[in-house]
């Protein structure tokens, strides 16, 4: 279903309710440059890591899994038996995910606040365009919890919208991103109304800040494997 949610001002903060869930896949594809390519790229690195670590724990968590797109990408690339657990606090999103992945018997979804979940030991975690919605004071706590739950040689994927530390560059990057959204069919009003709804809800860090945060909780190897202007995909390994 086409995203027309912001044809007019919502007069409220953005939240992942039923209206958003109905159009979320279209919103993702038109709002995040190379969205599906990043999912495939992330799935590749997890699949390769599992191949090279034969004793890897057969469990992967996707936190803030929304409509389950990443698990579709993972199931295309992972050959061995693996348990996929998606956690999201939006039941409308999870209903969409369950519909899309009803034919996969290795997928389980839980409607919970992932900040309160006690994770089992896992071979991989993913936070794909999710950390930016976590309150800054809680991000380090969450990442430390993930790090402690990762098996040795496990990986964490972090996809994020980012900002530049240079004020002028940041303004230019945002302007280019808005041009991208216009080319995807969004009007000036839709872009402005969505920006208004996301203010103080989506709080981006710079690339350096995200990498420093990951390193501060224990990750020794953090790599930006993809970047387009103000979007990036990071792979962090626990060694």
Curated annotation (Swiss-Prot):
GO MF annotation, one: carboxyl- or carbamoyltransferase activity
Reaction equation(s) it catalyzes: prephenate + S-adenosyl-L-methionine = carboxy-S-adenosyl-L-methionine + 3-phenylpyruvate + H2O
Presence of keyword Transferase: yes
Domain of life of the native organism: Bacteria
Alphabetic keyword roster: S-adenosyl-L-methionine, Transferase
EC number: 2.1.3.-
Any one biological process term the GO annotation gives: tRNA wobble uridine modification
Record-listed S-adenosyl-L-methionine binding positions: 35, 64-66, 88-89, 195
Sequence similarity: Belongs to the class I-like SAM-binding methyltransferase superfamily. Cx-SAM synthase family.
Chain's role: Catalyzes the conversion of S-adenosyl-L-methionine (SAM) to carboxy-S-adenosyl-L-methionine (Cx-SAM).
Subunit structure: Homodimer.
The name this protein goes by in its record: Carboxy-S-adenosyl-L-methionine synthase
